[in-house]
Regions:
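Extended, compositionally biased flexible segments
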Residues: 1-18, 23-35
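Helix-start/capping segments and mature chain N-termini
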Residues: 3-4, 8, 29, 36-234
């Protein structure tokens, strides 16, 4: 996989944006291409990778967003595909996302598909809570995607001395490839509003965003070995 990405980025290196916040978005795909109809696993698949020059995810800077807590629709349920980067997961989220957007909310906070009371993900991102100086995020136990950005943030947080505990809510933020780290300022459930902090981006969220994007854009040293240099071969 890494070799394939290096080859493609080497070919498309001139498309890599150089402005702050911009990036060359890389997305791998695997899809079935058997000929015929029927419900069965495919025997043949196509693996491909696309690159897309992308502007800053936050056009006006990184600012907290308002989140709608969804307790009717579900994104995933035990035994299904919630733990994978599966296209069907996105399809299941469209209706709830549209309804939230109509009410002025940026994303949907997904609850578990059984009891609908445990937090799982926000939009298409993993979500994290800062509670009494500690950080909590949903476990990846079958319905939550073990995101790479999530894993990177957890590793950095542990390096900074944070651990998990229940307590008073201090910060909420989502983690994902495109947005990297997305702060949350408000949660709404059944007409009740929960305001996070003072409505501004919290210090841990800001530090995570600055560190992650700083390493991605070469502004600070990559101390984790996450950046792969691509040599010009073409």
């Amino acid at each position: 996989y890494i070799q394939a990405v290096e080859t493609l980025v080497g070919v498309d290196r001139d498309w890599v944006p150089h402005s702050d916040g911009a990036s060359l978005y890389i997305r791998p795909f695997v899809f079935a291409n058997d000929v015929g109809l029927g419900v069965h696993a495919s025997k043949h698949y196509i693996f491909c990778i696309i690159c897309a020059p992308s502007g800053a995810y936050y056009a006006e800077g990184i600012n907290p967003v308002r989140i709608y807590v969804e307790d009717e629709y579900i994104r995933a349920a035990p035994g299904l595909t919630g733990f994978t980067k599966c296209g069907g997961n996105y399809a299941a989220s469209i209706k709830a996302g549209e309804l939230a957007e109509e009410q002025g909310y940026a994303q949907v906070l997904w609850l578990d598909g059984v009891e609908k009371k445990y937090v799982e993900e926000v939009g298409s991102m993993n979500i994290m809570f800062k509670i009494d100086g500690k950080v909590y995020t949903a476990a990846t136990v079958g319905t939550v995607l073990p995101g790479v950005t999530r894993r990177s943030c957890i590793e950095l947080l542990k390096d900074w001395g944070y651990e998990v505990i229940e307590g008073k809510l201090g910060e909420v933020f989502g983690t994902g490839t495109a947005g990297v780290v997305s702060p949350v300022k408000e949660l709404v459930w059944k007409g009740e509003h929960a305001y996070i902090g003072d409505g501004k981006i919290g210090p841990v969220t800001q530090k995570l965003y600055d560190t992650m994007t700083g390493m991605q854009w070469g502004k600070i040293p990559d101390t984790k070995g996450w950046i792969v240099p691509v040599e010009k071969k073409y």
